[in-house]
């Protein structure tokens, strides 16, 4: 994938959601909510501040992140669906 996001934008691939509950019930794909976790695939150069300086992003490529249900814009690239969002749409980085 050859995408380079601009400024404070981030490219995120949604992580697959569990299709089975803890009690063993299988959740049909139509009823499953979209996952709110993903892996950062690419990041922009940073946020341009009012004084013209660039603040580097806190997230890095490979980070696992949490984001809101309606965060980002979904796009297809090379047959894969990814999200393009601003860093401020990311709520947390999942620590390993």
Swiss-Prot record:
Family matches, as Pfam families: Cpn10
Cell compartment(s), UniProt: Cytoplasm
GO molecular function: ATP binding; metal ion binding; protein folding chaperone; protein-folding chaperone binding; unfolded protein binding
UniProtKB keywords: Chaperone, Cytoplasm
UniProt record, GO biological process: chaperone cofactor-dependent protein refolding
Family annotation (PROSITE patterns): CHAPERONINS_CPN10
Ranges in a coiled coil: none
Domain of life: Bacteria
InterPro entries for this protein: Chaperonin_GroES, Chaperonin_GroES_sf, Chaprnonin_Cpn10_CS, GroES-like_sf
SMART domains noted in UniProt: Cpn10
One cellular component term from this protein's GO annotations in UniProt: cytoplasm
Listed PANTHER family: 10 KDA HEAT SHOCK PROTEIN, CO-CHAPERONIN GROES
Entry's family note: Belongs to the GroES chaperonin family.
Record function comment: Together with the chaperonin GroEL, plays an essential role in assisting protein folding. The GroEL-GroES system forms a nano-cage that allows encapsulation of the non-native substrate proteins and provides a physical environment optimized to promote and accelerate protein folding. GroES binds to the apical surface of the GroEL ring, thereby capping the opening of the GroEL channel.
Quaternary structure and partners: Heptamer of 7 subunits arranged in a ring. Interacts with the chaperonin GroEL.
Name this protein carries in UniProt: Co-chaperonin GroES
Gene this protein is translated from: groES
């Amino acid at each position: 994938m050859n995408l380079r996001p601009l400024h404070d934008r981030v490219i995120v691939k949604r992580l697959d959601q569990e299709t089975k509950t803890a009690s063993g019930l299988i959740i049909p794909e139509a009823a499953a909510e979209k996952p709110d976790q993903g892996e950062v695939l690419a990041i922009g150069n940073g946020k341009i501040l009012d004084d013209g300086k660039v603040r580097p992003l806190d997230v890095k490529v490979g980070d696992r992140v949490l984001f809101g249900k309606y965060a980002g814009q979904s796009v297809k690239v090379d047959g894969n669906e990814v999200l393009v969002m601003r860093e401020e749409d990311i709520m947390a980085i999942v620590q390993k």
